[in-house]
Amino acid sequence: GILDVAKTLVGKLRNVLGI
């Protein structure tokens, strides 16, 4: 669902930022 997609995008961003 949309929440799953949002969580995936946030996870990718966090990995890229190294947070």
Curated annotation (Swiss-Prot):
Keywords: Amphibian defense peptide, Secreted. This is Uperin-2.8. One of its GO terms (biological process) is defense response. It comes from Uperoleia mjobergii. It is found in: Secreted. Shows antibacterial activity against B.cereus, L.lactis, S.epidermidis and S.uberis. Disulfide bonds: none annotated. GO terms for cellular component: extracellular region. Expressed by the skin dorsal glands.
